[in-house]
Amino acid sequence: MHTIARALVASALGALLLAAAPSPTADLRGYSTDAAKAERDWEAKLRAVPSPDSLREYMRRLSARPHHVGSPYDKDNAEWILAKFKGFGLDARIETFDVLFPTPKERVVELVAPTKFVAKLQEPPVVGDPTSSQQAEQLPTYNAYSIDGDVTAPLVYVNYGVPADYEQLERMGISVKGAIVIARYFGSWRGIKPKVAAEHGAVGCIIYSDPREDGYAHGEVYPQGPWRPKDGVQRGSVMDMPLYPGDPLTPGIGATKDAKRLAVSEAPTITKIPVLPVSYGDAQPLLAALRGRVAPADWRGALGIIYRLGPGPARVHLRVKSDWNLKPLYDVIARIPGAVAPDEWVVRGNHHDAWVNGAEDPISGLVPLLEEARAYGQLLKQGWKPRRTIIYAAWDGEEPALLGSTEWVEAHADELAAKAVAYLNSDTNNRGYLNIGGSHSLENFINDVARDIEDPETKLTVWKRAQLRAIADATSADARQEARQRADLRIDALGSGSDFTPFLQHVGVATLNLGYGGEGGGGIYHSIYDDFKWFTTFDDTSFVYGRALAQTVGTAVLRLADAEVLPYQFTGLAETVAKYTKEVEKLAKDKQDEIRERNRELDEGLFTATADPREPDVPPARDALPPFLNFAPLDNATDALTRVAERYEKALGRAQANGGGALAKPDVQAVNAALLRSERALTTAAGLPRRPWYRHAVYAPGFYTGYGVKTLPGVREAIEQKNWSEGDAQIEAAGKALQATADVIERAAEQLEKAAP
């Protein structure tokens, strides 16, 4: 779900910079010398197993037919994956949930004035692409969880349809009240667009794919090239997932057969206005019929028209009607029991459902997971037994709303809180560079893994290639110096958009999200053209980056499962949180300065005097100056976290010295018991304001960004949204969570100091 176009993989998961301190030993963090040698032998055997030929055949099978939630092939794929897991020698089963998943019965977008035009709302098959013609099995082009509606209204173009765009429209004197808005994809997660439109009084929303973003502006369109063709449409969910993901009717609990459910009319995550997506072929006549003010330069796409804002004279009729029945989900769960610590779990997942055939999204990420499982089966036959329990999951229902992972996490929340060591996620996988997002306590760990993986194109390590890219992309001498001198690649904070969300942000499980990408590009996201033919023509055609992902994540899972001491590092976490703290303090000051300056300009009459009399802008509203915010609780907690992180590093260094014999002492199990709670301590029982499902105090999807992360979200969004009355309370809540984490790390350090005084 989270990948919108291959060209954006690097930015969606983040540019890889460099930071953090090196591991306390030259060998594996959390391992004695002898254990590290044995571990490296097992890891080498694991990395020898994944085969590009196997990956290709898995993809051919899994993407052969459309397999959306509730479809026959979705269940068939789940049963096939189950058989594969069992064939590899793993204990596996299917867990079923019943979720609300609407599918369309009626869809209409038509221009009724000043001329007539009826949108196709249909993607045509392509000659030479056999699966593109499976129309009877394909989901129509639609946005899931759009409310039913039938409206006719003037049309207004709102650019990306994010809050800043509406502020600009208001300055230009343009209202969307009572109108249907048309917004282009990108700029935010799609569900934000109808949400913000409804908040401003719109009665309907159309979302279209402009060729500026993923069409002919970038190159040849499919089938001649990889980019979105004229009639290609991006399906997708518009549920208000910043409130909560998963089944709209069972927030916070697993959607089992007997679960207590909300009525559909009570579900707050369903849109307030009807929504439909269209192609740029269907959008062009609608946009061309608009008059009024010419759109600002940065609002103009690549269609051969004058982009105007409206409202009108274009009037549009929009109708959406769906089947609102429950559909079954099939989560495929495999388990390898731990031999020493069976109640400590390392969980690995990728989803198996798609909007249509889904070769890129999600099968390119799923097939490496299957090869990892096959590799574990071979290791088991050779006598390997993991120290901890390993759980492999092929999730259903990710595309509509992270359904399968969220319902599984909610159903097993207590067990996960007690047992989960880490969750490792992937989604789509492409050619290019290793992209990493996740918990900063795992930053050093995943860097060490990346140093052991070979890039299939350059034969460098994937770590070294990413470092060199950071140097090449640096925009200043200081940035280049930092890229060369820092020890580790800095990983990105995670917002939402894939199955890591419930693990990290609801339960507080340390998380990594991994994938390759950034080379090439494409515009087939969530369309019928995301299929085996497209992928094997334009993407990782030799499947060598699929093999690299299996080697990367397989090694990471194995290393986490076998470590004597969990390989978290907290100095990187402390440094990152300190950076976030400085950011929000600066944000508060900048917001105060901005309001003070704007109010002064209003007093001076600046906006009226400088407005074009022929196209006058409305002066902005006056804001009251924000109150003083007391950041002391956050600063003090960050300082405490930094101190105990350094203490823990010293203690671990002593424990791993002289061969690491101290790691065999009984005190070490108490260390792991404490470490297991470190990410959990970063959550708060109350959760975030107006969305208590999200509990993490450091990472959350933005209320108005969707996928995009907000760090220290309670504090940051209080400032951004000018909810000053919440500011001090959120600073206090974040400070308490950070202090609780520092206390947990201090207990772990004390236990290590007992083992190695």
Residue ranges and their predicted role:
Residues 24-41, 60-175, 211, 226-245:
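Noncatalytic luminal/extracellular "stalk/propeptide" segments of secretory-pathway proteins
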Residues 41-49, 63-72, 141-146, 157, ...:
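Second-shell loop/turn segments in exported
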Residues 118, 229-294, 341, 397-531, ...:
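Metal-dependent peptidase/peptidase-like ectodomains
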Residues 133-168, 243-360, 374, 378-382:
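Soluble metallo-hydrolase cores and metallopeptidase-like ectodomains found primarily
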Residues 154-227, 339, 343-345, 355, ...:
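A conserved hydrophobic secondary-structure block that centers on an alpha-helix together
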Residues 211, 332, 348-402, 407, ...:
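Alpha-helical metal-binding/catalytic segments enriched in His/Glu/Asp
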Residues 391, 452, 505, 519-579, ...:
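His/Asp/Glu-rich mid-to-C-terminal helical/loop segments that flank catalytic regions of hydrolases
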Residues 657-757:
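C-terminal amphipathic alpha-helical interaction region
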